[in-house]
Curated annotation (Swiss-Prot):
InterPro entries: DUF445, UCP032178. This is UPF0754 membrane protein BC_0879. PANTHER family: UPF0754 MEMBRANE PROTEIN YHEB. The chain crosses the membrane at residues 357-377. It is found in: Cell membrane. It comes from Bacillus cereus (strain ATCC 14579 / DSM 31 / CCUG 7414 / JCM 2152 / NBRC 15305 / NCIMB 9373 / NCTC 2599 / NRRL B-3711). It is a single-pass membrane protein.
Length: 378
């Protein structure tokens, strides 16, 4: 009975000592959190291993992340993975579609994104661009003649239209002189003509009688205007004037119309502020609906593919510029010792328990062996 009690005692004590020793060793990894002093003498093994080496641990964790976890090769492989790319494109399509089908006004959406004074800025910038374009256009075209400035098609149309213009002018002239107003105007012109030519022609006019002269002149004027030769004459005159105009510099226009007046007229016709306001008051869905399918099916996949390609080609540079090792080091350095302990224990809790149990098992086995040795040595 005493033999079995001795063996049980040695085994139990060995298990307790082994288990507690391992448990204490594990605790000493983290505890105490601060050094303990007796007078000026620092107690050995204080603070615990991890609190004492926390800065070194932070540096090593940073190196481990950069050198073994988030490597350029690993990230590059992930970025070129076909399944990952498909998933990312699908996610991007869903998220973009949510934005472009939003029924909120474009103005409200921009304000939500903290884009302030967008209407004023857009109006100002558009007007500035239009003004700059007009000035650039005029600066270029003021160096041309009208023949150089006008498109060939316009020149052709004007030349083809000259005979029709001549015919129109003559038709209007005939209609005018056939009317009572035209006859009255012609009568006045005859009176003025005789009055300006002196006494002799005045006497002739009085002798012929005014009404008689008008009645004789009116048909001749109408007949003259209706002749083909007159039409050809007017066409030739207009053609010559058109040729003269084509040879003149566009810059001469500046003497009649100032640049700022042209700019002001264009801006007034375009109504930039009103157009921008109407555009911003539309819903995002209304604005994007005409191009929604193109954005979702073409733009998004293309943008994601190009982004991933760029990311793959520049992943090493990106990681270097991110300084991940420093980020990890700084973050770990800010952890309290308690948090660091909880973090390690949350990962290794089961394993550390098994180490404690293993210590108890080994201690128990050693105690059993000791009990057996004592039994045989008696």
């Amino acid at each position: 009975m005493n033999i079995w009690l001795n063996m049980l005692t040695t085994t139990g004590l060995g298990a307790i000592i082994g288990g507690y020793t391992n448990h204490l060793a594990i605790k000493m990894l983290f505890r105490p959190h601060r050094p303990i002093y007796i007078g000026k003498f620092q107690v050995p093994f204080t603070p615990g291993l991890i609190p004492k080496r926390r800065d070194e641990l932070a540096v090593q964790l940073g190196k481990m992340v950069v050198e073994h976890l988030l490597t350029p090769e690993g990230i590059g492989k992930k970025l070129t993975n076909e399944e990952f790319q498909k998933g990312l494109i699908h996610w991007a399509q869903v998220e973009v579609d949510k934005v472009i089908t939003n029924e909120q006004s474009l103005r409200h959406m921009l304000e939500k994104w903290n884009v302030a004074h967008v209407e004023e800025e857009a109006t100002r910038k558009i007007e500035h661009v239009i003004t700059e374009k007009i000035h650039a256009f005029l600066a270029e075209y003021y160096t041309y003649t009208w023949e150089q400035a006008l498109p060939h098609s316009v020149n052709e149309k004007v030349e083809n239209a000259i005979p029709n213009v001549s015919a129109f002018i003559l038709e209007r002239g005939i209609s005018f002189f056939e009317s009572e107003e035209g006859k009255a105007r012609l009568s006045k012109m005859i009176d003025d003509f005789f009055a300006s030519r002196g006494t002799l022609l005045n006497l002739v006019g009085m002798f012929l009688g005014n009404v008689s002269v008008v009645d004789r002149v009116q048909p001749e004027v109408i007949k003259f205007l209706g002749q083909d030769a007159t039409k050809q004459l007017l066409t030739d005159v207009l053609q010559k004037e058109w040729e003269k105009l084509k040879g003149r510099d566009v810059k001469e226009l500046e003497a009649f119309v100032e640049k700022e007046m042209i700019v002001s007229s264009v801006l007034s016709a375009v109504k930039v502020e009103e157009t921008v306001s109407k555009f911003l008051n539309q819903s995002v869905q209304q604005v994007c609906e005409p191009v929604r399918e193109t954005i979702i099916e073409k733009v998004v996949p293309s943008a994601v593919a190009k982004g991933l390609k760029w990311g793959t080609e520049n992943v090493e540079s990106i990681l270097n510029n991110l300084h991940l090792a420093e980020i990890v080091q700084q973050e770990v350095s800010t952890f309290s010792t308690e948090r660091l302990e909880d973090l390690v224990l949350s990962i290794t809790k089961n394993e550390l328990k098994m180490i404690t149990y293993l210590g108890a098992l080994l201690g128990g086995m050693i105690g059993l062996v000791q009990g057996l040795l004592l039994l045989f040595l008696r």
